[in-house]
Amino acid sequence: MEPVPLQDFVSGLDPTSLPRVLRVCSGVYFEGSVYELFGNECCLSTGDLIKVTHVQLQKVVCEYPETGQTLELNPNFTGLFSPLTSLRSYRTLEDLVSAMPQNSTRWPIYFKSTQRIVTKASVVPEDQPLRLEAVEIHHGIRYARCVQVSKTKELLHLPLSQKGPFWRCKPSAPQTLHQILQDPALKDLTLSCPSLPWNSVILKPQYMLQAIMHMRSSIVKIPSTLEVEVEDVTASSQHIHFFKPLRLSEVLAGGGPFPLTTEILEVPEGPPVFLSPWVSFLRKGQRLCIYGPASPSWRVVASSKSRKVPRYFMLSGAYQGKLKRRPREFSTAYDLLGALQPGRPLRVVATKDCDGNEEENPDFSFLAVGDRLEVLRSGQVCGTKGQDIDVLVCQRLSEQSGEEEEDLEEIEDEAEDKEQILLPLYLSGSFVEEVNDSRRYNLVDLTAQYSLPCEVKVVTKDTRHPTDPLASFPGLRLEEKLTEPFLVVSLDSQPEMCFEIPPRWLDLTVVEAEGQPAQVARPLSIAPVEELSEAFYYSLRKLPASESQAPPPRPPKSQGINKKQQNIQSCKESSVKPQVVEPQKSCPQPQLKAKTLEALPKNKSNVYSKISVHKKDRKPNPQTQNSVLSMKPKTSSSLGKHSTMESHLLPDPDMDDHDYEEI
């Protein structure tokens, strides 16, 4: 093979033929010159051997032949290109036909126009390929019989006086940027693309070569625009041994043999993944011993619960510390629904007063500090404007202790007096889970029995990990469980420093080193807890495996003050004759959707009679019980009763709208 410029060699290279061995023949360089290429040094001298292992398209330069102007395109450019047979454009169809040779082989002629062609029958868009099949005469006027090169194959008769400009093109469908670059027949051809500002362009791709040098273990990145001539000597250099760089992901996929002694060639750039001491040893030239895949392959991401700056950890499935469950905290009713599991009761206590937005639906309940609830299921009700509102159906529990309440449920479950209430999913509040569990779990049992996230406290350290930091925190939040393969690795110079590396997030480039590892047997002690950097933690939480549920529904827009006062005044006027007025006209009452809420007996007594005096008064909501417990539409008598009761609840217009607490 004759020496060729590096750019020409790469442009005609078949990626499937890699790797290729090149010899540097000549180039523009001085004695001892060094090309700094993306952090890798490469001194190219005459006679150097380069083994090209990978070629990546960096960008494509488009050149306008008429003016020499250039434009850079990204490799993901989505425009379509069509090859042109010449650089000449034709003003009319007659000029195009006249330029063709006068023989039978000139038909058909493929062409296109850079302007729209408007006819009585249709409109031909710009850059639409056309096939000119023949010239016909109708009523003394010469027409070109053309067919659109498309699915419709519409037949057109265009007069030869039709103005363009027109361009001849090859009979092929438009192709993408990668298709054009991969076709050797289209190399250096003039192309047209509707997405570009010029009628014709020439593509000049630029590549980045990844290669290794003979007698050097470093990886070299060489741009194809480097002014150097090379010669392909792959066939005559089979006996020459090159170092073979590997990524940890390739070592993991290869499956061994293990242990494998390697030397680090390159460490990926970017923010740190782990904050462990062994990270500082991962640098170029460091020798590692790889023992194979870690077991088990699943991990748990956790964050500390403390008033100070939170810290983030990744726990191995082999973690042997003992954990106790802690009460979970919820800030919305939507979070309560997400934590509800089939077959597992969820009981919470309200830690602040919550208003259920009775203006949107009178059935929404008011919660006071200390209210105990049991989450039952989700449901739907109709709002005042007729829209569907997602709700959480809960059961208000009495103030008895959990053990006494369980005994009552076993003895007289049906007779116990409990009230069902509705909470809109958008309700913002503060709830704490009731936990009566003193068991000590290991990580395997805890993740098998309870869904994550989960609040825990590490009560016993992992005895194999003396520096276990998790026991020092008052609480730990187990965020999610991930399944990711890790490699067990140790420093060749310090076999006792053993750790696990995830190739997906820390894909080191290594080369197999000569010699046996200092420790052949698999290490027994591996740190089961690794601290994560804050940047990596948040990037990890964005992975598809950790995508959370859809955000909670937004609360309805609040009405203006004037509109509220008008509604109050209209309700007051309508309450003069409660037995006659129709509530839907002045204060429309929403109806529960029977398909989502179960029917219960109607003769339930009010649970407020059981509330102790020292508790804060709740807002009375006489319709909640009837609406929740009844599945049938309200009768006229019930509507009248509601109007009568509501008339007593209307505020006095002379009084302030605020509710002041008496001191």
Swiss-Prot record:
What does gene deletion cause?
Homozygous knockout mice for Themis2 are viable and produced at the expected ratio. Mice show normal B cell development, activation, or Ab responses.
What switches on expression, per the entry, is described as: Up-regulated by pro-inflammatory stimuli, such as IFNG (at protein level). Down-regulated by anti-inflammatory stimuli, such as TGFB1 and dexamethasone (at protein level).
Question: Which InterPro entries is this protein grouped with?
Answer: CABIT_dom, THEMIS
Q: Which UniProt keywords apply?
A: Cytoplasm, Immunity, Inflammatory response, Nucleus, Phosphoprotein
What is one GO biological process annotated to this record?
Answer: T cell receptor signaling pathway
Composition bias, Polar residues:
559-577, 621-641
User: Which cellular component appears as one GO term in the record?
Assistant: cytoplasm
Q: Where do the segments described as CABIT 1 lie?
A: 2-237
Q: What is its main location?
A: nucleus
Does the record carry Nucleus as a key word? Answer: yes
Residues recorded as bearing Phosphothreonine in the entry: T596
Q: What is the effect of changing P555A?
A: Drastic decrease in GRB2-binding, but no effect on VAV-binding. Partial loss of enhancement of LPS-induced TNF production
Q: Which residues carry this modification: Phosphotyrosine?
A: Y660
**Compositional bias ranges of the Acidic residues kind:** 653-663
Question: Where does tissue-level expression of this protein occur?
Answer: Expressed in both developing and mature B-cells with high expression in immature, follicular and B1 B cells. Also expressed in macrophages and dendritic cells. Down-regulated in splenocytes of mice developing arthritis in a collagen-induced model, not in those of mice failing to develop the disease. Transiently down-regulated in splenocytes of mice infected with influenza virus.
Instruction: Tell me where in or outside the cell this protein is found.
Output: Nucleus; Cytoplasm
Q: What does this protein do?
A: May constitute a control point in macrophage inflammatory response, promoting LPS-induced TLR4-mediated TNF production. Determines the threshold for activation of B cells by low-affinity and low-avidity ligands via PLCG2 activation and its downstream pathways.
Q: Give the quaternary structure.
A: Interacts with VAV1. Interacts with LAT. Interacts constitutively with GRB2, LYN and PLCG2; these interactions increase the activation of PLCG2 and its downstream pathways following B cell receptor stimulation.
The record's comment on protein family reads:
Belongs to the themis family.
Name the UniProt record assigns to this protein: Protein THEMIS2
The record lists the organism as: Mus musculus (Mouse)
